[in-house]
Design a protein with these regions (language model features):
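Active-site cofactor/cluster-binding pocket
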Residues: 2-266
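Gly-rich Lys/Arg/Thr-decorated short loops/hinges at beta-loop-alpha junctions or inter-strand turns
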Residues: 21, 158-160, 227-244, 262-269, ...
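Conserved thiamine diphosphate
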Residues: 88, 143-145, 149-153, 363-412, ...
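Flexible, low-complexity linker and terminal segments
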Residues: 248-258, 266, 396, 401-625
């Protein structure tokens, strides 16, 4: 929280503090609606003109016992005047809807931050379920923060006493009281919040009305008891945002939109063959809503079928996609290799999660990098891309589709649970401004001279002939093919040639140069990362630069092939540290690709994003060595 200036606004004894940024964390039981409250608050903030970055954090259990520590769900929102790169390490305002939430989440609140609690949920039975040893949780936890205690449950019950709703339904509205109070504390747009609720519950107007009534009660509560609250806050707007229309979007939705845009640009139908798996399922759900845009989705019987059906769709002339997470990629690998052998365009989306095996389904890691690069039998090169942020998922999904279509190859797109579920303010692009996509469809005049594996001499990719094109009938399959003719072949020299041709095609796909941020010319330390860690590494870079350290950042989004200038960039610096959410997979890969460099490592495998403060501490230690 960066204070810009302070002033009294004259509405009471409280002081309104003007801020450049502010972080709110909603927490409660998994059924308390913390994700909804956080999403509405982030959307309202984006509508107001602020930049945002969010972090939904929920347990891997389908439903832990109510009121227990293992069942706590949280949603953190970082609102800023200027560009916000991370959800923040700790919050300025914590909402704890019960005793368990306070016990597990207070450590995420800054020492000077405030905590809102529902005092009705701190009874003896609640404290016992939350594993307290005394009847004074504040003292037991050593909390020194300002506590805003509110009887939220009682107020909500009174508010909806005449609604005709049952008790369970009434209690589901508690999150809106907390949201209303937060909106008052931060001078947020209540009308925008109400409109979101009306839209969400459009088919249940009584539910919408109840939630809006409770939302207003929370806001009014703040107005009526302002004398007991030390500060209210207002995050300023007017930062250096590009003009245009913005929306609050999470990474999975942005990925879906990027794929739709690519299909539109290429003039193709979009096909998704998928099997539900956390945290990738929302891509399937989102694409299923857009049949009117030429999108076909099939929820298949298993992961293998999802990928195999997508290969079939690619043969049929569609932009073909299959979506999953790490465990699903294990199952899809043979079908992915079928796309390698047949040289058909396919986008394989891996929304990475904690592993191995079932692992941590709702948590984030980057541990599938080497799987994406090498996790198939045989010499099976695939382009591998990694999105850097929730909004970047749109552009990298579009780019993955473009590369797949133009170079007739399967492409792996890596995102992760953090950026897939987190959100940011997305500037909606015009379709005309996006790069052209030109699939290499066989032309009518090639009839007679065409063969199934005839290649474009410039790109090395074969031409795309689809069923129904007279004179271009052919078959494909997983057995090795003869060069050009596509006939089955076991001849040794032909296998070597085809292996080399497939590798050459992928290795020579043009990708943008690797850019360096920070003290690019005279840095003593270069930080290297990839994918969804960009925001945290960028924030750590800013912190180090502000203290006079000579550091730079090179963040990879194109992993295979690497940018042509990668070796040249890395060799400029005396020291290079690779920071990643795994045991060192990118560092190992770079050692294979770039000789003569000692790569230092900063690795974390906790199922959580990086902490900016810990990154700064670690990089400072490396600098001081």
């Amino acid at each position: 929280m960066n204070k810009n200036k302070e002033k009294h606004v004259g509405t009471g004894n409280e002081e309104t503090v003007q801020l450049d940024d502010f972080i709110v964390r909603f927490s409660g039981d998994s059924g308390d609606g913390m994700q909804l409250a956080g999403n509405i608050f982030s959307t309202v903030s984006a509508i107001a003109g602020n930049d945002i970055c969010t972090f939904p954090n929920y347990p891997a259990d389908i439903r832990a016992p109510q009121g227990t520590r293992s069942g706590v769900s949280a949603f953190q929102v970082h609102v800023g005047k200027k560009t916000v790169y991370t959800p923040g390490d700790k919050c300025d305002l914590l909402v704890a809807m019960n005793a368990a939430a306070l016990a597990t989440q207070y450590k995420f609140c800054k020492p000077e931050g405030a905590i809102i609690i529902d005092t009705d949920c701190f009874k003896e039975s609640d404290l016992k379920k939350a594993e307290y040893s005394t009847d004074d949780p504040i003292t037991e936890l050593g909390i020194k923060n300002e506590i805003i205690g509110v009887s939220i449950t009682s107020i909500v019950k009174d508010c909806l006493a005449d609604s005709g709703m049952d008790n369970k339904s009434i209690l589901k509205c508690r999150n809106m009281f907390a949201l209303g109070l937060v909106c008052w504390l931060l001078d947020s747009n209540m009308e925008a919040a109400k409109e979101i609720l009306r839209d969400k519950f459009a088919r249940k107007p009584a539910v919408a009305d109840a939630n809006i009534k409770v939302l207003e009660a929370g806001y009014d509560f703040g107005s009526n008891v302002h004398a007991s609250i030390e500060h209210t806050y207002r995050v300023e707007t007017g930062g250096a945002k590009r003009p245009g229309k913005y929306m609050d979007i999470n990474g999975n939705k942005a990925t879906a939109y990027g794929l739709i845009a690519a299909a539109e640009k290429a003039g193709l139908r979009l096909y998704l063959g998928s099997y539900p798996i956390t945290p990738a399922t929302d891509v399937l759900h989102e694409l299923a809503k857009h049949k009117s845009l030429g999108v076909a989705t099939v929820q298949c019987e298993d992961e293998i079928a999802g990928c195999a059906s997508a290969v079939g769709a690619a043969f049929g002339g569609a932009l073909a996609v299959t979506s999953t997470s790490g465990p699903g990629v294990c199952l899809k690998s043979e079908a992915m290799n079928l796309a390698v052998m047949t040289e058909l365009p396919l986008v394989v989306l891996n929304v990475q999660r904690g592993g191995p095996s079932t692992g941590l389904p709702t948590k984030s890691e980057q541990s599938d990098l080497l799987q994406a690069l090498f996790g198939r039998n045989g010499e099976s090169p695939m382009p591998v891309l990694a999105a850097a942020s929730p909004t970047d998922c749109f552009y990298m999904a579009y780019e993955a589709a473009r590369i797949a279509l133009e170079h007739m190859t399967p492409v792996v797109l890596l995102t992760d649970a953090f950026i897939a579920n987190g959100s940011g303010a997305f500037l909606i692009p015009q379709i005309a401004d996006l790069p052209q996509i030109n699939p290499p469809f066989v032309k009518e005049e090639q009839q007679g001279a065409w063969t199934p594996y005839l290649r474009n001499p410039e790109t090395g990719c074969r031409y795309w002939a689809t069923p129904g094109m007279k004179g271009f009938e052919h078959v494909v399959g997983g057995l090795e093919k003869s060069n050009e003719t596509g006939e089955i072949s076991g001849e040794p020299h032909n296998h070597q040639l085809m292996t080399d041709l497939r590798a050459h095609k992928v290795a020579n796909i043009p990708v943008p140069d690797l850019e360096v941020e920070g003290a690019a010319d005279d840095a003593e330390l270069l930080i290297v990362g990839f994918g969804g860690t960009y925001g945290h590494l960028h924030s750590a870079l800013d912190s180090l630069l502000s203290k006079g350290e000579k550091v730079a950042l090179a963040h990879l989004k194109y992993i295979n092939p690497l940018p042509k200038n990668t070796a040249e960039v890395l060799r400029r610096y005396k020291r290079v540290v690779v920071a990643e959410l795994n045991g060192g997979q990118l560092a190992s890969y770079l050692r294979m690709k770039v000789e003569g460099i000692h790569f230092e490592q900063y690795n974390q495998v906790m199922g959580q994003p990086f902490s900016v403060s810990k990154l700064v501490e670690a990089f400072n230690e490396i600098i001081r060595k």
